[in-house]
Amino acid sequence: MDAPVSQYLKSWQFPLTDYPTEKITVRQLLSHTAGMPLGDFTNIYSPGEVMPSNRDVMTDEVVLMREPGTRFSYSNTGYNLLEILIEDVTGQSFSDYIRTEVLLPLGMESAAFDIDEEVTPYPPTGYNLRGKPVPVYLYPSKASGGLFATAHDIALFALSGMKENPVLSGDSIKLLYAPQSNKIGVYGFVFESYGFGHYLEKLPNGMLSVSHGGQGNGIMTHLQAVSETGDAIVILTNSQRSWPFIAYILSDWAQWRGFPSVSMGRIIWGHYGLCVVIGMLVSASILVILRLVSTFYQQKRARFRLIRVSAAFILLGILIWCACQKYLFITSVFPVLSVWLWGTAFVFSIVLLLSVVLPACPRKKDKL
């Protein structure tokens, strides 16, 4: 767990980076504390299409962002490095090894990393953040999100984390759920810490709840479990707009099973909060427009001009920055409301600029 992974890598080596890669360990990779980047999860291919190898992708994407072991930063590339590590240590392909050593022993017989037209049930078409259809696709890397599985398969996986089984011993399960990082950035809004492959939270009744979601182009999934009671829920959706929907389901599930609450339910309050912010921006825009109209014949617009210009350019700068990002957490969580937020913020900034730029029209009596 704590030995440098570079000691075991035979078929791939780290590209040049500003930080010491020889310090990266399996513990850090499993807990997203190795300083590695998120990775490009939009790099997708159709079944049967020629695609680069995981090693080629890793060579392009692995540029350490910070000193290994310093802080949490969710990283798909970290798990894809574990894929290479498993292949180099076992001499098998990652897909074959995981199927033999994990999937089949747990009874996940229909789960697979590869897919063709004969697979049943065939995965449904997904729908992205804009509501456009996304046909079934594959990633060059498997470990971070390349598994095709049914709700029944994932339920069996959830059960494996509740009691000793052919894959995990009791001690391994305890280690799996031991907090590795308590400062988890924006994820701290709904979770307390991160273990190995699971987000962790203490419920109000003192029980430990573990969870993890999955997101890709056109899909959104979530697994939540409470080992002490044997409860778990698996949610698989073919829409990338599903987080608010998932939050409502989890809130209802917790109430049904007698849990006080689960923290993912906070997304519901975030949804309401964004509605309030959008309403405030709309109201502010209307007020500025009304004031602009009412003072059209008055030369009194110099007051707070610098503040209005500054606020407008700050808003526009933020919007431009957001538009340049490949991935935004808020857009992922609130895909519909975020569009309204950007739109109302843009309108408000333009209205502020107009309130400064448009000249006041002198009254007729002033002309005389």
Name each region found by the language model:
Residues D2, S6, S95, I154, ...:
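Internal amphipathic alpha-helical segments of the cytochrome P450 catalytic fold
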